[in-house]
Amino acid sequence: MITSSLTSSLQALKLSSPFAHGSTPLSSLSKPNSFPNHRMPALVPVIRAMKTMQGRVVCATSDKTVAVEVVRLAPHPKYKRRVRMKKKYQAHDPDNQFKVGDVVRLEKSRPISKTKSFVALPVIARAARKAEAGGDELLGLPLESQQPA
């Protein structure tokens, strides 16, 4: 009688050792949730780390492919001075619109081939961007030289 009550209490506790049975039961491996499952808010900002880069086209002889050289500043491993590091990327140019010397924006995409996983997009020039944004007039006021006398 004492043995049966002891056995039933041990079964209720479900004491098991991985050494005794060869493996741990899957029910004990599942992590308990200490917090309730909350849904994420709808307006979560998308993190886009190193998915876009800017570079200059150095080779455009292949069909629908351009080689783009991206220059970045990185600390030298020994001297800790920031040096220019160059790297060439193969990018997809579906319309063959870019020529050597064009400045393009590389955007990460699905792998297109073994070496191509970026798409080349045109970059709006800085002067055109300022003119488009109305950079000549500060706060909507004309410059002093543009005012009538």
From Swiss-Prot:
UniProt cross-references to Gene3D superfamilies, sorted A to Z: Nucleic acid-binding proteins (2.40.50.140)
Transit sequence range: 1-49
UniProt entry keywords in alphabetical sequence: Chloroplast, Plastid, Ribonucleoprotein, Ribosomal protein, RNA-binding, rRNA-binding, Transit peptide
Disruption phenotype: Reduced plant size and pale green leaves.
GO biological process, one term: plastid translation
GO CC annotations on file: chloroplast; chloroplast envelope; chloroplast stroma; chloroplast thylakoid; mitochondrion; plastid small ribosomal subunit
GO molecular function, one term: structural constituent of ribosome
Compartments, as annotated in UniProt: Plastid, Chloroplast
A Pfam match: Ribosomal_S17
Major subcellular site: plastid
PANTHER family in the record: 40S RIBOSOMAL PROTEIN S11 FAMILY MEMBER (PTHR10744), SMALL RIBOSOMAL SUBUNIT PROTEIN US17C (PTHR10744:SF7)
Quaternary structure note: Part of the 30S ribosomal subunit.
Protein role: One of the primary rRNA binding proteins, it binds specifically to the 5'-end of 16S ribosomal RNA. Required for optimal plastid performance in terms of photosynthesis and growth. Required for the translation of plastid mRNAs. Plays a critical role in biosynthesis of thylakoid membrane proteins encoded by chloroplast genes.
HAMAP family, sorted: Ribosomal_uS17_B
Family to which this protein belongs: Belongs to the universal ribosomal protein uS17 family.
Name of the featured protein: Small ribosomal subunit protein uS17c
